[in-house]
């Protein structure tokens, strides 16, 4: 019980960090000009653009770490297991660790969110299927007993 409480507080801490990064004012993360062209400007805004780029990298790093943690949690909770998910996810995360283009990073983030939703759906389906199996056997026994009672009463008459 204490483990889940500490894990929840850790997740909320990560969410707060991400919210703080999104709510930074006077700095737009998605400017219309490319980062390379904006750093070449001689208007004196070079320092702001570099900070902007650092903020974007920091935000993406937090998001990716949170997604990896969600995958590990799903492995712990679900029927696949942590080892299976880690063996599949870690090479993918490592192969994409050197990406620098924000569009490609966002594509990978969206793909990971999709995979998380699919794993959640698989876990729910697995749970539903197991519950259905257990109840089907129970109801089958009840129905068999009920039918046996009907047959016994018909024999008595």
Curated annotation (Swiss-Prot):
Record localization: Mitochondrion
Annotated protein name in UniProt: Electron transfer flavoprotein regulatory factor 1 homolog
Gene this protein is translated from: etfrf1
Stated family: Belongs to the complex I LYR family.
GO BP terms: negative regulation of oxidative phosphorylation; respiratory electron transport chain
InterPro entries: Complex1_LYR_ETFRF1_LYRM5 (IPR045296), ETFRF1 (IPR052000)
Domain of life: Eukaryota
UniProt keyword terms in alphabetical order: Mitochondrion
Organism: Dictyostelium discoideum (Social amoeba)
A GO cellular component annotation in the UniProt record: mitochondrion
Keyword Transit peptide: no
Record carries keyword Mitochondrion: yes
CDD domains xref list: Complex1_LYR_ETFRF1_LYRM5 (cd20265)
